[in-house]
């Protein structure tokens, strides 16, 4: 099977700078300089990230055809939702085609699946099609799999996190992005469940440096290939310094 992740990994490891938060969480998650996409893209370049993760509007206006396109690969997030609606089950609609992502210069596409939502079957079908379309265009397909819904009692439990990882494998994802499940042992179970689909950690909300770096040590020891980190870098007062510490853990 072809390695579609080659353009966005280094010797099988990966460090991605995620910046799809403006869509998903709103400007409240983008304090200070982080509201400026150029600030984020400069961190991605100077920090040596394997890719930056953007929604299509940011890619159109700040990445495609700019100096950044030659300096850091792009993972285009092709679905999303706002966080204002708090009721009922979630369905995250696709807002960009795989073909258009390719035109924007993306090396990979990302798609969120809410495992446990009443609409997860639609998202499974969407992502299955997206994988096929991406591979035809020599692009990687990455699944963000987040357990949500009435019947999900603990979205970061050992079993449900492993189930999220397994969904990525079953749907043909090249990589699956999942949340931390509380310990190295628990995360190792998720990595095993993912089989030949590579696993990266979802960086999550801003926490202390010590806590985040320990989580990074746990997941790399468990077999994850890296992280897609956002707030713990660009909300940090010294984003390049915390990047250096993350890099040491992943690539040492």
Model regions and ranges:
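Short glycine/proline-enriched turn or capping motifs at secondary-structure junctions
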Residues: 235-240
């Amino acid at each position: 099977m072809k390695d579609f992740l080659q353009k966005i990994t280094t010797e099988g490891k990966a460090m991605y700078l995620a910046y799809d938060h403006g869509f998903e969480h709103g400007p409240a998650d983008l304090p200070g300089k982080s509201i400026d996409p150029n600030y984020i893209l400069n961190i991605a370049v100077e920090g040596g990230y394997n890719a930056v993760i953007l929604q299509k509007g940011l890619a159109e206006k700040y990445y495609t055809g700019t100096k950044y396109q030659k300096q850091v690969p792009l993972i285009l997030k092709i679905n999303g939702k706002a966080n204002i609606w708090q009721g009922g089950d979630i369905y995250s609609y696709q807002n960009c085609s795989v073909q258009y992502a390719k035109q924007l210069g993306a090396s990979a596409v990302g798609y969120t699946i809410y495992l446990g939502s009443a609409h997860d079957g639609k998202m499974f079908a969407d992502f299955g099609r997206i994988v096929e379309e991406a591979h035809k265009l020599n692009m990687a397909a990455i699944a963000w799999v987040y357990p949500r819904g009435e019947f999900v009692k603990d979205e970061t439990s050992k079993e449900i996190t492993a189930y999220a990882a397994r969904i990525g494998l079953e749907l043909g994802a090249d990589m699956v992005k999942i949340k931390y499940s509380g310990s190295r042992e628990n995360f190792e179970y998720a990595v095993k469940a993912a089989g030949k689909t590579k696993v990266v950690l979802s960086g999550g909300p801003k926490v202390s440096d010590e806590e985040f770096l320990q989580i990074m040590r746990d997941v790399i020891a468990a077999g994850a290939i890296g992280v897609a980190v956002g707030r713990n870098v660009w909300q940090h007062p010294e984003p390049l310094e915390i990047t250096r510490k993350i890099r040491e853990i992943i690539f040492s």
